[in-house]
Amino acid sequence: MANPKEKTPMCLVNELARFNRIQPQYKLLNEKGPAHAKIFTVQLCLGNQVWESEGSSIKKAQHSTATKALAESSLPRPPPRSPKADSNSNPGSITPTVELNGLAMKRGEPAIYRPLDPKPIPNYRANYNFRGMFNQRYHYPVPKVFYVQLTVGNNEFIGEGRTRQAARHNAAMKALQALKNEPIPERPPQCSEEKKETEENSDASKSEISLVYEIALKRNLPVNFEVLKESGPPHMKSFLTRVTVGEFSAEGEGNSKKLSKKRAALSILQELKKLPVLPVVEKPKVHYKKRPKTILKTGPEYGQGMNPISRLAQIQQAKKEKEPEYMLLSERGMPRRREFIMQVKVGTEVTTGTGPNKKVAKRNAAEAMLLQLGYKASTPLQNTPEKMDNKGWNGQRAAFPETTSNTQKGILHLSPDVYQEMEASRNKGVPGAPGNFPTAKEIGQGSAGPFCTPSVGNTATIAKELLLSGTSPTAEALVLKGKAPALACGSIQPSQQLEYLAHIQGFQVQYSDRQTDKEFMTYLTLSPVQMTFHGIGSSIPASHDQAALSALKQLSEQGLDPVDGPIKVENGSCDIQAKRLAERTESKPTNSGTTAQDCKDSKAVV
């Protein structure tokens, strides 16, 4: 319905039925049509009378039936109700005080309410010469009356009521009756004239505050806005703002800070425009130095050291051609030894690459594609040996470390040149010392060493003496005591010193070598105590010396556990011996105190 207070046909039917003391009944008779456009038929029974009607919804059909029933029904109608008397003379829900506030804001005059003291009750003194009146037992209190003074501009109104709010409403009603017919006062002509002049002389797109800042910036004057005063009720505030530009100052007042600031700027603009015009000074042209080119022309070595995948993508982008397409062709091998084959396609060129993982295979495929396209290989700038995984004799994985890592404390690195200098100095210090030492075959094949129960102290002492002076009096004494042929140990290589110590103490030394691009790696094992060491050098003897030096250093600090029973050195390659030794260690767990961490700490290069 247009008016929400207007009653609907169904509501009127209910009133008619209530007046005649009958019950209206609505029945849904039929429902037809598609789901999106149904038509409902509703029947209304009001006493003995029946009406039917249709609609697009049940509610609309009910309203249509009720409308037809109201028009055709012969039942007596209820008398119309008289409208309720509105005690409030003010139409709507707006109170007189709110309406007066709106009118006062339009007029630009604040409405101020002040409470007044009530009138004093008159006191009549009785004459004491006559007989007193009958004293009433119950006295009804005199109702208290509140008074409020209302000031709107130059007009004053007095309101009274039983409460302070009623007195305010009474005063507001009197003010509304007096001010409704009065015209709204116009603003002072000075402000309008100043505003017109300012708009004519200044740019219309700029405010007065912006113009003040522009003039102050040109004349290098400071600008400061300050709110001096804030007065008036909360709904009708009045602000007084002062603006200072150098030696000039002005004030502006308004019902908001923005308006007072604007009026203050408008006032001071008149003073700033009276200043003399500044002379025009041409600014010198600023010459900017051209930045040097940081990107140099690429030489023939450009791209070396880069990731081949990124390099290949950059080449295709520079050619404005399609980027390389990578695809995994196959995956083969055991679960822990996978081998992936990746294919890269650039235009009509196709290459493949293999690797232990997809990343390495993709890199190798990109490297092969670069070589096929005629570019140089993307060799790294710094040759860093790849990490090599190898199974130790005890079944544990032992990785050859990278040369770029730091050396552990206590591990000494000696190059072949240093070894030669040390050897020369030792030869000078010990004349007549033999330059050669018997090899492993000469130490007796098929027979045990002369001593089967070496002590930890003897091993550490002999190792220290060999490291310091190149000879070991303790070892010579043990040889004489055992009635074995004396084996002198002069200033020889660390690998020969270690073999001499192994012959004296009765343990076996085994080397396993592997070659990389420019270096040799040695995996040294002392059996059956299962102590492992590593060495890296430019040649096999140098890598052997590195590993042996690390072993001597470790033995000089910790010694060697006793060896149970003689050791028989078998003929054959080092790989065969390693396999047989691995079978022995699997069947008999070692009681050596040397763990994987000890082996890791004993590496020659970390």
Swiss-Prot record:
InterPro entries: DRBM-containing_protein, dsRBD_dom, STAU2_DSRM_1, STAU2_DSRM_2, STAU2_DSRM_3, STAU2_DSRM_4, Staufen_C. SMART domains: DSRM (SM00358). Residues 57-97, 177-205, 580-606 are annotated as: Disordered. GO terms for biological process: anterograde dendritic transport of messenger ribonucleoprotein complex; germ cell development; germ cell migration; intracellular mRNA localization; protein localization to synapse. One of its GO terms (molecular function) is mRNA binding. Keywords: Microtubule, Repeat, RNA-binding, Transport. Residues 192-205 have a biased composition (Basic and acidic residues). It holds the Pfam family dsrm. SUPFAM superfamilies: dsRNA-binding domain-like. RNA-binding protein required for the microtubule-dependent transport of RNAs within polarized cell types. This is Double-stranded RNA-binding protein Staufen homolog 2. It comes from Danio rerio (Zebrafish). The gene is stau2.
